[in-house]
Structures are given as C-alpha cells and as structure tokens.
Amino acid sequence: MKKMTKKAADRKFKLGMHSYTLHLSGLGESWGFQSEGKTYAFEKVIDLDKFMDLAVEEGLEVLHITLVDLDKDTSPEHLEAVKENAKKHGLDLELNVSFNAPSDPRVNATIEEALEIGHSIGATLVKFSTDVEHPHPISHSCMCPEAMTQMAEIVNNFKKNIPTIEKYGMKIAIENHCDLFSDEVIWIVEQLNHPLIGACCDTINSLVMSEGVKECVDKMAPYCYCVHFCDNRVFADPDGTHSLGCAIGDGDIDVVEIMKILREKAPEELDTIDLEIELPLS
C-alpha cells in the first residue's frame, strides 16, 4: 500500500469490543450447539452490567452487544435501564442482530424489531447479518441467482424501514457474516443508497466464502460504518484446514496493514473499531 497521508496516519478510532469475544462465558452468541432439534448455549457467568464494568476497567469506549446480552428481555423498562447504565459507564452501545442465525436463534430479529430495540437502548449503530444462503460450490457463487433473489428481498425490506431509520438517526451496517461476499454487501449498500446505511467488515469472515482477506477489506473499506477486527491462525494438518482464534497481532492477518487501509479509505462514519477474538485460542 502506498504511504498514508498525514490525515489518515493521524486518524483515531474509538475502541470497542464485540460481546462474542466472551461467548464461552455466555455472552454474544453460542456457536454450534444443535442436537435432536434442540439448541444449547454456554452457561452465562457474566451479565451485561458486569460486562460494562469490565469494559471501563479495560479502557473500552463502545460495546457491540446482541439480544443474548439483553437476556431477550425487550421490555421498555429493561431497555431503558440498559441505556441508562451505559450512560453511567460512559459507554456507547451498538446492537448486533441476525435474520436467521444458523447457530443461535436468540440473536434473531426483524429489521423493525431491531430498530426499535436499538433506539430504546440508545444504540449509535445497528449491525445486521442477513444469513443469505449460497449454493455449493461456494467459491464461484458470488452474485449467483439464488443469492441475488434473497438479497433483492432484503433490499426491499430495508427500503420499507428507511423512514424509521431516518427518524431514529442510527447508522445501519450490513455484515459479510460468512454469508455474503464483499461484492454482495457492496451491492446491497449501493442499492439502498442512503447516508445512514453502510457495511460492516469482519476481517476473518471472508475466508469462509473463499475470498481473500486483503481483497475483501480493500473493497469494503470505502463503505464501512462498522468493523469486527479479528485475527486468526490459519493452518493445515492431517485433520484438515483450520482457522483458530488468537490474540490480535499473533495470527496470520496483517492487522497493521488492515488498519492502514481503514484509516485511508473508510468514511468518517467509521468511528469505532470493535475487537473480536475467537475462543478458545489456538
């Protein structure tokens, strides 16, 4: 990458954390616990109040939370209490929802539900995973008819909710959540063509779609309103190919170069970097 401009080099972001980082403690979203039609989750050993305390202790400014962290309690009283507690801690909140999560249905919500919940907790941003299904083989399925049909419906559903998005003034981010190629996220954002609607780039998820990390970040950066900043070790052994979590900077993602790309290319709407670590660590 060419040398950064001084403006880009001096650019600062708030430091946030995705609650999925603590999913083994019951926060965020549990992953892969379906058996005989039942869904299982890690026991919750930390609640949102304690998470806010830890965030302040660690110098975080933003928490990126899910409906699991709200205990699926969306009563006005509870959401107002969450909003006030975040204010008390000096924290901004972002809300993370899915349409049809394959792993943990507790995180699912409609656009309408997510906007109301996000507004009620004072969220600055609502991030959506669209859960678009692609046919196999995945590697050459970008913008395929099966995916485009689903994406067109998603665009129409967001368009119906633009008056509410404008009313509440929250930023909206569409993620490459192991279900969308970067070009597909960009297509959705460009179809919506609204200043409050952008992309969320996860720095690991592109690997699931057989898409290069650098290429994905390069493409998505100009649209990014949200970033899940991850680093994994990627390796092969006799048991197959693996992508395992690690401390940021210890893996195979060049996080320094990615940060340079974001500082140079991302719009002003990207004001926070949300750290996310896969557990258990490699």
Language model features with spans:
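N-terminal pre-domain/capping segments
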Residues: 1-125, 156, 194
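Histidine-acidic metal/acid-base catalytic patches
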Residues: 2-59, 182-196, 200, 207-282
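Alpha-helical scaffolding segments of alpha/beta enzyme cores, especially the outer helices
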Residues: 50-53, 77-84, 88, 109-120, ...
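Short, surface-exposed connector motifs at secondary-structure boundaries
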Residues: 61-64, 163-172, 194-199
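Conserved beta-strand positions in the central sheet of alpha/beta enzyme cores
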Residues: 64, 94, 127, 228, ...
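Acidic-and-aromatic substrate-binding clefts and catalytic sites of carbohydrate-active enzymes
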Residues: 65-78, 99-109, 134-136, 176-183, ...
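A short helix->loop->beta-strand "cap" motif at the edges of active sites that frequently abuts
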Residues: 89-91, 123, 170, 266-273
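Active-site groove signature of glycoside hydrolases
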Residues: 118-147, 167-182
